[in-house]
């Protein structure tokens, strides 16, 4: 039976500081390391044999993957990394304190940017964009594909082709797959898997460092889901 494990990275240093993070590359906090370690322990305690893992290009997800596989004694399995699993790009909001953003733009506007399905935050500046384009991890990426800002809908548009072309192929082969990613890239996968409406998906809360297991049919219909 195919099995999919979705796990949002452990708490990051910017999560702890209440900052918009998006594509900014930050480390796990001490709490986040503990969450990721515990996630791996839960995988081991439940005797889940992972065949392959997928993660983003951002350190907090990469490190979470490492802790999960190390603690479950499966660090030797293949791990594939893709920008398509990166967090939603929060544009010009990245690096801002969320409370400060509410004071500057208004509570309602910030809520719309955060929780609407198809509304993007303000675009990043050209200077911010140039910093991403200079980052070696994105050298392979056509700069026309590099977002200035993303809605959840935009995130889904880049995540689902990666699901179809890569992740789902291992599941169709009956394997157990770990996806260690981010709140919004995981939200996009859940929307697709469960056919969640545009209105409902924005209210889904994705816990940090909590493995969410999907048991699937051979054609990848959801049979059951549960947190470890």
Swiss-Prot record:
Pfam families: His_Phos_1. Keywords: Gluconeogenesis, Glycolysis, Isomerase. Pathway: Carbohydrate degradation; glycolysis; pyruvate from D-glyceraldehyde 3-phosphate: step 3/5. Substrate binds at residues 8-15, 21-22, 60, 87-90, 98, 114-115, 183-184. The record marks 182 as: Transition state stabilizer. It catalyses: (2R)-2-phosphoglycerate = (2R)-3-phosphoglycerate. Its EC number is 5.4.2.11. SMART domains: PGAM. GO terms for molecular function: phosphoglycerate mutase activity. PANTHER family: PHOSPHOGLYCERATE MUTASE. Belongs to the phosphoglycerate mutase family. BPG-dependent PGAM subfamily. This is 2,3-bisphosphoglycerate-dependent phosphoglycerate mutase. The gene is gpmA.
């Amino acid at each position: 039976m195919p099995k999919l494990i979705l796990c949002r990275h452990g708490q990051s240093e910017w999560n702890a500081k209440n900052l918009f993070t998006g594509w900014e590359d930050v480390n796990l906090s001490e709490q986040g390391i503990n969450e990721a370690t515990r996630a791996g322990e839960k995988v081991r305690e439940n005797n889940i044999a992972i065949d392959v893992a997928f993660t983003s290009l951002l350190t907090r997800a990469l490190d979470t993957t490492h802790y999960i596989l190390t603690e479950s004694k499966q660090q030797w399995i293949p791990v594939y990394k893709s920008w398509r699993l990166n967090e939603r790009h929060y544009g010009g909001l990245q690096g801002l304190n969320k409370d400060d953003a509410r004071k500057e733009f208004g509570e309602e506007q910030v809520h719309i940017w955060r929780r609407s399905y198809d509304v993007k935050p303000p675009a990043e500046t050209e200077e911010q964009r140039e910093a991403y384009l200079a980052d070696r991890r994105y050298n392979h990426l056509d700069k026309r594909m590099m977002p200035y800002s993303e809605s959840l809908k935009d995130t889904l548009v880049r995540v689902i082709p990666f699901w179809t072309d890569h992740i789902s192929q291992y599941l169709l082969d009956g394997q157990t797959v770990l996806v260690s990613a981010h709140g919004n890239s995981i939200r996009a996968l859940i929307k697709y898997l469960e056919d969640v409406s545009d209105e409902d998906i924005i209210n889904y809360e994705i816990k940090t460092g909590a493995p969410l297991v999907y048991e699937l049919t051979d054609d990848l219909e959801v049979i059951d889901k549960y947190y470890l």
